[in-house]
């Protein structure tokens, strides 16, 4: 049995832990927060600050098969980069690609340098889409409809044309020479631009080629998530994130049969093969529902989940998994899968009925 050590116990960590378990791996978690969200979901939990006590992590690396940073704490990532040669196992992370991807201005300059279509900067008239230079895609993002609202923005805020359309995502895993473009997904967003649901999409040759080019020109050794908008103007790449994603990998797993943790391991050991055809073509629904006042189920995004106190499995049967995130209001992560959309929809109805029976949820 392989063992993976995850540095970070929030939602990225949950996704990586979930897929590691699906691959039959043991999960060791390291987080400086004694109340780390997934502390009870991991097989082993060690609470310490890797920056203050790196020797503990280096010692752990002697008895695990890989270390995977799954956090967006820049100080932590930069510190791990500074000691990466001291680990006794591979660190499944491309630090240079992350340096480019976390800086949205650097990312956009990179897109332009290789001819990737992206929203126009500082358009002459509204609506504008504004976002901080270095946060996750949804944090601090909003639409501005009036020029006067630009006046209070921080100088380094990105101001782009607002592009209407569907938000789509595609993961790429590279070994530095070969780049496996995996499975397209649709990211369903709420009014705060946070994702509350993910579903699979058919293959899109243009998006796949662009994602391959983005990985190959780095060149990527690790995993990267490419996000784009499909709208009336065609495809526009909005960002890349060179770190293990949350939410989309589970949908990739059930719809394509590809486990991104296993693929990432191969990138640092045997190498990856470029994917010509997806091995499976099934359907999956992944969504977050908050149990609100009067039992009403409310779609919510990751920003709500991240405020929870504990996250673990609540219910399981073939084609259905439900996870409970405890907090002021419970949030359920619902995962349904089947051979097609119809079968998966029936699983979803069954899963919702479980919440009705056990919690009195209003459907």
From Swiss-Prot:
Domain of life: Archaea
Any Pfam family hit: PylC-like_N
GO CC annotation terms, alphabetical: cytosol
Enzyme class: ligase
Residues given in the record as L-lysine binding sites: 11-12, 72, 246, 302
GO BP: pyrrolysine biosynthetic process
Catalytic activity, EC: 6.3.2.59
Entry binding sites for D-ornithine: 169-171, 225, 243-248, 302
InterPro entries xref list: ATP-grasp (IPR011761), ATP-grasp_PylC-type (IPR003806), PylC_N (IPR048764), Pyrrolys_PylC (IPR023890)
Cofactor note: Binds 2 magnesium ions per subunit.
Pathway(s) it belongs to: Amino-acid biosynthesis; L-pyrrolysine biosynthesis
Cofactor: Mg(2+)
Positions with a binding annotation for ATP: 10, 31, 49-50, 72-73
Keyword match Phosphoprotein: no
Keywords: Amino-acid biosynthesis, ATP-binding, Ligase, Magnesium, Metal-binding, Nucleotide-binding
Residues binding Mg(2+) 2, per UniProt: 239, 241
Binding locations of ADP: 104, 131, 138, 160-163, 239
Record bears the keyword Nucleotide-binding: yes
Residues where Mg(2+) 1 binds: 227, 239
Catalytic activity: (3R)-3-methyl-D-ornithine + L-lysine + ATP = (3R)-3-methyl-D-ornithyl-N(6)-L-lysine + ADP + phosphate + H(+)
Any one GO molecular function term: ATP binding
Record remark on domains: Contains two adenine nucleotides bound at the active site. One ATP molecule is involved in catalysis, the second adenine nucleotide functions as a selective anchor for the C- and N-terminus of the Lys substrate and is responsible for protein stability.
Function: Is required for the biosynthesis of pyrrolysine. Catalyzes the ATP-dependent ligation between (3R)-3-methyl-D-ornithine and L-lysine, leading to (3R)-3-methyl-D-ornithyl-N6-L-lysine.
Protein name: 3-methyl-D-ornithine--L-lysine ligase
Taxonomic source organism: Methanosarcina barkeri (strain Fusaro / DSM 804)
Record lineage: Archaea, Methanobacteriati, Methanobacteriota, Stenosarchaea group, Methanomicrobia
